[in-house]
Amino acid sequence: EVKLEESGGGLVQPGRSMKLSCVASGFTFSNYWMNWVRQSPEKGLEWVAEIRLKSHNYAIHYAESVKGRFTISRDDSKSSVYLQMNNLRAEDTGIYYCSTGFPSWGPGTLVTV
């Protein structure tokens, strides 16, 4: 069974930083691209960042709205993906989810700026 478990959210002041984590299980983590997405009432579901595989040199892509502020990373040995968020803004408020090529979602973690 594929499981994704996000953590690290909370209440943070504008301009501050926060790091989110996601632990995956039930599949070979190192074989899958990983994404962070977020959901808010204002913008709906919004893609945030993507990190590819070791064989792709861990290529990374970001949404324009977070480029230069957010950093995605992964640790295949821990089946985990991370999102370091700096210089947070009110518009970054939302529920953050990690996702991959399965129709499975974790509970998400709420970030309130």
From Swiss-Prot:
Domain called Ig-like: residue spans: 1-113
The keyword Disulfide bond belongs to this UniProt entry's keyword annotation: yes
Bridged cysteine pairs (disulfide): 22-98
GO biological process: immunoglobulin mediated immune response
Source species, domain of life: Eukaryota
Gene Ontology CC entries for this record: extracellular region; immunoglobulin complex
Name of the protein this chain belongs to: Ig heavy chain V region AMPC1
Organism: Mus musculus
Lineage of the species this protein comes from: Eukaryota, Metazoa, Chordata, Craniata, Vertebrata
